[in-house]
Amino acid sequence: MDFHSLLAVSPIDGRYAAKTASLRQYFSEFALIRNRVRVEVEYFITLCEIPLPQLADFGEGTGMSRDELFTRLRQLYQSMTPEDAQKVKDIEKITNHDVKAVEYFIKENFKALGISRWQEFVHFGLTSQDINNTSQPLMLKEALENEYIPALKEVISILSADVEAWKDVPMLARTHGQPATPTRLGKEFQVFVSRLEEQLRQFGQLTWPAKFGGATGNMNAHKVAFPDIDW
């Protein structure tokens, strides 16, 4: 929906919208819907690859190979448009449940692809938070890797050049706010470079846990339905 920036609730989408526009692909409601579709699709594909007995023949009689169908399913999120996301929102008006709307959206596309006989394994055994608790870490991870870290590296590069340019520039240092011994401007900027490099190193060590556990966190439905699979 188009709106005047002065009507935005938050400065993020108002005053600073031009500066934060690249984050919309990660943190907008559209992005959340797209990643929910992504998690649901990849989960279904994984069930096919195990395979569950009922999915061993997935794709037979459709005129397409399994890999071709997997590609078509992945296009649901890889090529998703705001218009597609609006379809999910329209379904939500009926379901009154945002994740269930995603499930129904995917099932509608199963019908369009001629694979509706396998559609009941979409969201099999899961609860909504399994989808949310996987989608949201993906959003954070990709925003950090694709937006924040490149920007941080650019800042470090600029400051490092300043450190080199100013390495012999003397300046007065202070202790307790009082003039003290001299230092060099380049060295003082190197302090900030070192701090940012340490933060960059720590970002590189981050892990991104997700959670699949079913309704009560014990994979109960999975175990009852398929007891021979190590869930």
Q: Can you describe what each PLM-predicted range is?
A:
Residues 2-222, 226-231:
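A helix-coil-helix interface module used to build multimeric assemblies
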